[in-house]
Curated annotation (Swiss-Prot):
Role played: Represses a number of genes involved in the response to DNA damage (SOS response), including recA and lexA. In the presence of single-stranded DNA, RecA interacts with LexA causing an autocatalytic cleavage which disrupts the DNA-binding part of LexA, leading to derepression of the SOS regulon and eventually DNA repair.
Organism name: Variovorax paradoxus (strain S110)
Entry protein name: LexA repressor
The protein's enzyme class: hydrolase
UniProt xrefs under HAMAP family: LexA
InterPro entries: LexA, LexA-like, LexA/Signal_pep-like_sf, LexA_DNA-bd_dom, LexA_repressor, Peptidase_S24_LexA, Peptidase_S24_S26A/B/C, WH-like_DNA-bd_sf
EC number in record: 3.4.21.88
Length: 227
């Protein structure tokens, strides 16, 4: 995308890095991360380039935080439009990094497998080092029931497909025809699915009721810059 202001090659490189980091994690990189990625000897060199980008109006620097970088104007619009450029494929990785291709699951139809092709909205490409445990798919979060666990409406939950989970882990569970994200707690007689928001009740699964674990939450991609 052509910007209204002229950037040097190095400034464009740093701007691309900021956009990629925000798309990948929901947060901009630190000065140290920029310096390390681009081979600067110190974070001060990164700061000088950031100040130049701020003067040109493509970013805003926020004092008091190591990740205080906000995209503005054309730079922000360019990031928001990037998800539509390749026919449903959206890259959340930096150039040169090994990638995982993860299907994004939207709404799940009643009674059908969660990874059925009709549920796949698009494919995201992410760095294979982004998550400690490798996910099999991304699930778009709907609602605020897991708010206090930091999982917000519109976030992309990275899920490892499994039928097993331990007490206290956050799982994707199927209850009859519904799929939900909750914290698992097994008691002697019942299974409890706990929300992380006091406005939402605990779901109690009685013996004999339809219940199945579909996957385990292994990471999160913020919705901040994916709208």
């Amino acid at each position: 995308m052509q910007f209204a202001v002229k950037l040097t090659a190095r400034q464009q490189q740093i701007l691309d890095l900021i956009q990629s980091a925000i798309a990948r994690t929901g947060a901009p990189p630190t000065r140290a991360e920029i310096a390390n990625e681009l081979g600067f000897k110190s974070a001060n060199a990164a700061e000088e380039h950031l100040q130049a980008l701020a003067r040109k109006g493509v970013i805003e620097l926020v004092s008091g935080t190591s990740r205080g970088i906000r995209l503005k104007g054309d730079a922000l619009r360019s990031l928001n439009e990037s998800r539509h450029r390749e026919g449903g494929q959206f890259s959340l990785s930096l150039p040169g990094m090994s990638q995982l291709a993860l299907p994004l699951i939207g709404r799940v139809a009643a009674g059908s497998p969660i990874l059925a092709q009709e549920h796949v909205d698009q494919t995201y490409y992410v760095e294979n080092t982004l998550f400690q445990r490798q996910p099999d798919y991304l699930l778009k979060v709907r609602g605020m029931s897991m708010r206090d666990a930091g999982i917000m409406d519109g976030d992309l939950l990275a899920v490892q497909a499994t039928k097993e989970a331990r007490n206290g882990q956050i799982v994707v569970a199927r209850l009859g025809d519904e799929v939900t994200v909750k914290r698992l707690k097994r008691n002697k007689q019942v299974i409890e699915l706990h929300a992380e928001n006091p406005d939402y009740p605990t779901i109690v699964v009685q013996p004999g009721e339809p219940f199945e674990i579909e996957g385990l939450a292994v990471g999160l991609i913020r919705n901040t810059m994916l709208m």
